[in-house]
Amino acid sequence: MNNVDELTLDLPNFTGPLDLLLHLIRSQKIDIYDIPIAKITGQYLANLARWQTLDLQIAGEYFVMASTLLRIKSQYLLPKNDFIEEDQYQEDPRTELVEQLVQYSVFQRIAEYFKKRDEEMPITVAKDPSVSPKKEIEPLPLGEITSDELANTFKVVLERFKLRKPQVGKIEVHETSIEEMTSFLKNRLQKKRSTSFFDCIKSFQDLDQVIGLFLAVLELCRDHKILVKQNRDFGDLELEKVEINGK
């Protein structure tokens, strides 16, 4: 059975080369941390070749990724250096690509989550605001973080977390994870009025938990139940419970 022939895909279905690669990996249940580079490269190039025969306009970034895959594949074909001792660390040629795929996967899942939330909004029953209109239109206090700064800080969180390999290669974000992390954060803020994002994730082992907590923070911010502050660029996030009527 020819795996390349089985995985012929349509170009318009993908937003870019990382999206295509993730599809190839997920559809075959491949561990994202142990990619069979020769197999995936062959399937990727086969799809590019097919798109070219169909006269489809292929963005240059797809060819850049093709050259990256071929470079990684060629590094595996090179003979091992006998002068390097066995216990001396040699970086896996796939490392940078894996990091890109993991980060892309995370933000893809977050985007999917917000798209789902937007689709649910029309059927949401409105309720009276839990804070006064005056409070809602007040400018952000000094130190309070904007959504762009929050996103940039989350990238730093991913960098910190990348050395902790998740227990599974297939990265998923489920609604239950977000609900669990919302409860986790509420309980933490019940004990003390403020905490920090980095402190919260110290004991986490899975990237799924980090993503779930990040989305829980956004949910609680949106509902005006917590404030998020940052004292320096890309620094820790201070999470503070909003007191309403002394509660």
Curated annotation (Swiss-Prot):
PANTHER family in the cross-refs: SEGREGATION AND CONDENSATION PROTEIN A
The encoding gene: scpA
One record GO biological process: DNA replication
Keywords from the UniProt entry: Cell cycle, Cell division, Chromosome partition, Cytoplasm
Role description: Participates in chromosomal partition during cell division. May act via the formation of a condensin-like complex containing Smc and ScpB that pull DNA away from mid-cell into both cell halves.
Any one annotated GO CC term: cytoplasm
Quaternary state and interactors: Component of a cohesin-like complex composed of ScpA, ScpB and the Smc homodimer, in which ScpA and ScpB bind to the head domain of Smc. The presence of the three proteins is required for the association of the complex with DNA.
UniProt keyword Nucleotide-binding, yes or no: no
Family per record: Belongs to the ScpA family.
Primary localization class, coarse: cytoplasm
This protein's name: Segregation and condensation protein A
